[in-house]
From Swiss-Prot:
Protein name: Large ribosomal subunit protein mL51
Keywords attached to this entry: Mitochondrion, Ribonucleoprotein, Ribosomal protein, Transit peptide
Organelle transit peptide: 1-15
Gene Ontology biological process terms, A to Z: mitochondrial translation; translation
Family under the similarity heading: Belongs to the mitochondrion-specific ribosomal protein mL51 family.
InterPro entries (UniProt xref): Ribosomal_mL51
Gene Ontology MF terms: structural constituent of ribosome
Taxonomic placement: Eukaryota, Metazoa, Ecdysozoa, Nematoda, Chromadorea
Source organism (scientific name): Caenorhabditis elegans
Compartments it resides in: Mitochondrion
Record gene name: mrpl-51
GO cellular component, one term: mitochondrial large ribosomal subunit
Residue pairs linked by disulfide bridges in the UniProt entry: none
Assembly and oligomerization: Component of the mitochondrial ribosome large subunit (39S) which comprises a 16S rRNA and about 50 distinct proteins.
């Protein structure tokens, strides 16, 4: 009788110790910290053979007298012309007289993309048609493959919008986003049209 109870007890201990390694139970454990219950340590007992940045100290040769190579110190002029005028046009639409739009000052962006409202406001079709209207002749002459891929993409998107997204385009037209006389200098979200000036 004692041997049976002892073997049963050892089997229970063995199964519980094995279950301790795997946490697959659907019953939530009672822990003192919620993050601790979700933290799974999958690298226990693993020795990292590479340098962990921020964890391990920097590799140094012991008793080495050569100083660590560092870039030469540069004296930076905090009041240089470039630093002093940084961000001067950020609020020109609020503080200016309204004659200059902030999109016209985005010199780091391509000309055809300045002030474009983005993929969440304007769709890809409008952007590609605008690009094609500006660079159609140059693309056809210099890179015919890119020109062909652009035409294919526009054709596919036109089919998609004509058959699948008619309600969306109709809603945009009803919002008044499509003006008869669009502004060609920049693509503002309030002035969008398929008709664009060809340079």
């Amino acid at each position: 009788m004692n041997s049976n109870s002892l073997s049963r007890f050892t089997s229970i201990v063995r199964t519980t110790s094995i279950r301790g390694f795997h946490d697959r139970s659907s019953v939530p454990r009672v822990v003192d910290d919620r993050e601790k219950s979700s933290a799974k340590y999958n690298d226990a007992g693993y020795t990292f053979r590479y340098h962990q940045q921020g964890v391990d100290p920097l590799p140094r040769i012991p008793d080495c007298k050569v100083p660590v190579a560092r870039p030469a110190y540069k004296v930076r002029d905090q009041w240089s012309d470039e630093a002093a005028r940084f961000g001067q046009n950020d609020y020109i639409d609020l503080l200016g007289d309204g004659s200059v739009h902030p999109a016209q000052l985005q010199y780091h962006t391509p000309t055809w993309l300045r002030g474009f409202p983005g993929q969440h406001k304007a769709n890809e079709l409008i952007k590609l048609i605008h690009y094609r209207n500006l660079y159609d002749a140059k693309l056809k002459q210099n890179s015919p493959k890119r020109w062909h891929e652009l035409r294919k993409r526009i054709k596919y998107l036109m089919m998609q919008h004509n058959y699948n997204k008619q309600d969306e385009i109709g809603r945009e037209r009803n919002l008044g986003l499509w003006e008869e006389e669009p502004d060609y200098t920049y693509k503002d979200k309030s002035r969008r049209s398929f008709k664009d000036e060809i340079h």
